């Protein structure tokens, strides 16, 4: 979709004018023609209604969070399997260390290198600032369990599309929980590295010399010929499954960091866009024909046929961001009351459409009872019928694409009569002054209209956060209804139409100036 529904008029850039030997000097233009370019930027040029966010897709930020949480679940299971497979070597199974060939002791904390070796060897490493391998593995398994539960909760709540997973508060909780688990998982992985690799923590330790002397035999390139105890071997050497667990631990940390990134991105989009712009479920375009169309054609006579819907109503339905979800309900709130589409139509032969063109002396085409389009006649537009309720503007923002093609052509003819093609530099300078004046008026008027739209969007988000019985909800609802009445007032509509008229005028002046500059060069 287009991200610029209410585009600003083309900017007038005096610096684009390239003077040559035919052009006059800068004195004709007041000496400031090339000093500072005049850029036209609308006050609120981006209209969020024109962009739809498909959050049900797996490539969207919530979808990426689901994928990452699923990967965390798989990696946690793999880490648990790798660490659990090495727990048997920490229980002291096996024979005495190196048999009885080496009988000298390595200190009371390590026990004796003889047949009397027992649990004192393992527990001795827990003292004197030394990390016990079993304690490191237990800490890592505990953090893996917490990460598994958290990732499972995130995945399940997002997959079942619960209401709580579609709020900004939910993603704030995901950010905080992921940050906490990521930090704790980083600490657990570092502790696990120190526990399964004793030489990594031996430097500066009380038992550094004994550990190096005991483990160097496993690092030597040639075998010593002695019988090695399997427990001591697995203690000194990092097993492949332990290395895999370390790598997966860091990958879990990276996954949590990415979850935080996409959760922040999701919250920003939810703050920026209206709820009606976000599709949490796969939409079904409501383009089916009315039910029992064939039966209706057979039974209804030509004289009593209902008139076809006016083009303005059709545009409102097509442009509306509302879509029906797969579970049969509307993705978001209803934009206008039920009475606006259940009112009893007043039968009449010819239906006049309300004028939406910026030109006040033109009217929209009308439809006869047979459904044929009658050519418009140039006369003052008549007021719309009071029996037919008129829908307010689409949600909070309007686009200017509902203007009829005939009125645009006729309005262009009016501007051509008022601003004919430029024939002299003095006339160009006059157009420049008119453009500057109109541009300032357009920006001021557009800023006033956009302020109402942004305030409505802000109140709409606040109403979703408040309880209906609270005083804050009632105050916000009153202000919301007041602004809706302001948008439905004739003064607002006149300003909006005049703003469109100014945009058309500025576009025409810009075109005339551009044509003249191209002819000069």
From Swiss-Prot:
Region (Disordered) spans which residues? 301-407
Residue positions, PTM Phosphotyrosine: 367, 397, 401
Q: What keywords were assigned to this record?
A: Cell junction, Cell membrane, Coiled coil, Disulfide bond, Membrane, Phosphoprotein, Tight junction, Transmembrane, Transmembrane helix
Q: List residues modified as Phosphothreonine.
A: 304, 402-403
Q: Which InterPro entries match?
A: ELL/occludin, Marvel, Occludin, Occludin_ELL
The PTM Phosphoserine maps to 301, 312, 320, 339, 368-369, 407, 489
Q: What pairs make up the disulfide bonds?
A: 215-236
Q: Would the keyword Coiled coil turn up in this protein's UniProt record?
A: yes
Q: In which tissues is it expressed?
A: Localized at tight junctions of both epithelial and endothelial cells.
Modification note: Dephosphorylated by PTPRJ. Less-phosphorylated forms are found in basolateral membrane, cytosol and tight junction. More-heavily phosphorylated forms are concentrated exclusively in tight junction.
User: Residue ranges, Cytoplasmic compartment?
Assistant: 1-66, 160-169, 265-521
Provide the membrane topology annotation: Multi-pass membrane protein
User: What does the function comment of this entry state?
Assistant: May play a role in the formation and regulation of the tight junction (TJ) paracellular permeability barrier. Interacts with ZO-1.
Q: How does it assemble?
A: Interacts with TJP1/ZO1. Interacts with VAPA. Interacts with CLDN1, CLDN6, CLDN9, CLDN11, CLDN12 and CLDN17. Interacts with PLSCR1. Interacts with LSR, ILDR1 and ILDR2. Interacts with TJP2/ZO2.
State the protein's name.
Occludin
Q: Which organism is it from?
A: Canis lupus familiaris
